[in-house]
Amino acid sequence: MSRRHSAEKREVNPDPKFGNVILTKFMNSVMYAGKKSVAEGIVYGALEIIEAKTKQGPLPVFEQALENVMPTIEVRSRRVGGATYQVPVEVRSVRRQALGIRWLISAARDRNEKTMTERLSAELLDASNGRGNAVKKREDVHRMAEANRAFSHYRW
């Protein structure tokens, strides 16, 4: 990691259908091997399924799902003397978003539905209702941080 300069953050363009920057980041995370049009098809297909099932706009459901998955606190390893402590620290907003997106997609990929579009829509619906593996992952991270609260004075 460079000590002199931190990398410049690139500007992410909003997606063409909804004009949402977070949705573009989500699509970029779904994308494999540079196949953006395939990723767009998967995400937009999932949002259409959500719209059909909930009879409301898919964007609020997506945003609620992401909000329910984003962690506020996590543990980081800190070596003191010979021991390694799991120290709870607050998560920065950019990392919160990145972790939320990553967990949603990995939870969707682990599901049993037939196509990725169906898996993603089901996981987004579950997450927006406070269920699903992505929300469980966040709860586990929060529980871990709570269990290691005694080491919070070792913060950076």
Swiss-Prot record:
GO MF terms, alphabetically ordered: rRNA binding; structural constituent of ribosome; tRNA binding
InterPro entries membership: Ribosomal_uS7, Ribosomal_uS7_bac/org-type, Ribosomal_uS7_CS, Ribosomal_uS7_dom, Ribosomal_uS7_dom_sf
Keyword RNA-binding: yes
Keywords (A to Z) from UniProt: Ribonucleoprotein, Ribosomal protein, RNA-binding, rRNA-binding, tRNA-binding
GO cellular component, one term: small ribosomal subunit
Coiled-coil stretches: none
Subunit annotation: Part of the 30S ribosomal subunit. Contacts proteins S9 and S11.
HAMAP family: Ribosomal_uS7_B
Reported function: One of the primary rRNA binding proteins, it binds directly to 16S rRNA where it nucleates assembly of the head domain of the 30S subunit. Is located at the subunit interface close to the decoding center, probably blocks exit of the E-site tRNA.
Protein name (Swiss-Prot/TrEMBL): Small ribosomal subunit protein uS7
Native organism: Rhodopseudomonas palustris (strain BisB18)
